[in-house]
Structure formats: structure tokens, C-alpha cells
Amino acid sequence: MAKKVEKLVKLQIPAGKATPAPPVGPALGQAGINIMGFTKEFNARTADQAGMIIPVVITVYEDKSFDFITKTPPAAVLLKKAAGVEKGSGTPNKTKVATVTRAQVQEIAETKMPDLNAANLESAMRMIEGTARSMGFTITD
């Protein structure tokens, strides 16, 4: 018989840098998870993606065991890295802060494809372009 799910915990943690300190510790402590077990496993699984923020969905079962799924980094984080900026524009309709090429958008869309609700690469690229525009980025060919 399948284990009964008690709780889902969603977090965004820097790859390879999960620690028992807030915000990770309190979120997992409330769910009754072995915090050190999670942090060691997460850090081992994400060590190759250093510097990126990784969304993780932790499934907690009734017997306090858990498993987790790591997702691809958020599109905004990938866009900022591609453009080489710290943050997007506060007023994207007036102030443009950076430029990304369609090739960079395609690369990001290919990376994000498993997590996007897109039928093909073209629609995934349009989603990423929309995120870029809302951050005050200009898209060039």
C-alpha cells in the first residue's frame, strides 16, 4: 500500500547550500522532517548547479519519511544570469535594464522545458520572452 502524504513543502534554496538555519530549518521542523538528512541529500543532489536557486517540492509522509523533487531554476534567475544583471527593472515599461538575444532565450527555454506547461519550444520561448519583458529586458535577434 502506498504511503499516505501528510504535507507538501515548497522551498527555493541556493544549490548546494541548504543549512538547518532559517528559512529551511523552521519549514522542515514544522513538518517533522529530519532536517540534517534533507540538507545533506539536497546538497549532494544539487552540488553541480552551484550559484543557482533551485525550487524543491518536499513530500512528507505520515510516518515522517520524505522524498523531494528538484526543479529547474526560475526563469527570472536564468535571465538575470544570461544578461549579467543583479535585478530587473522597477518600472519595466519605462526603464530597460538589459538585453538578451533570442539564442539566450532559446537556451533558457530548453533548460526550463521539463517544468513549463508548453507544448513545444516556440511556445516555451514566448513564455520566457514575456518574463524577460516584465523584468525590463529587451530581446534582440
UniProtKB/Swiss-Prot annotation:
Entry's Gene Ontology cellular component terms: cytosolic large ribosomal subunit
Quote the PTM field.
One or more lysine residues are methylated.
The alphabetized UniProt keywords are: Methylation, Ribonucleoprotein, Ribosomal protein, RNA-binding, rRNA-binding
- Enumerate the SUPFAM superfamilies for this protein: Ribosomal L11/L12e N-terminal domain, Ribosomal protein L11, C-terminal domain
GO BP terms: namely: translation
Q: What does this protein do?
A: Forms part of the ribosomal stalk which helps the ribosome interact with GTP-bound translation factors.
Listed under subunit, the entry gives:
Part of the ribosomal stalk of the 50S ribosomal subunit. Interacts with L10 and the large rRNA to form the base of the stalk. L10 forms an elongated spine to which L12 dimers bind in a sequential fashion forming a multimeric L10(L12)X complex.
Protein family (similarity comment): Belongs to the universal ribosomal protein uL11 family.
What is the protein name stated in its UniProt record? Answer: Large ribosomal subunit protein uL11
Its gene is rplK
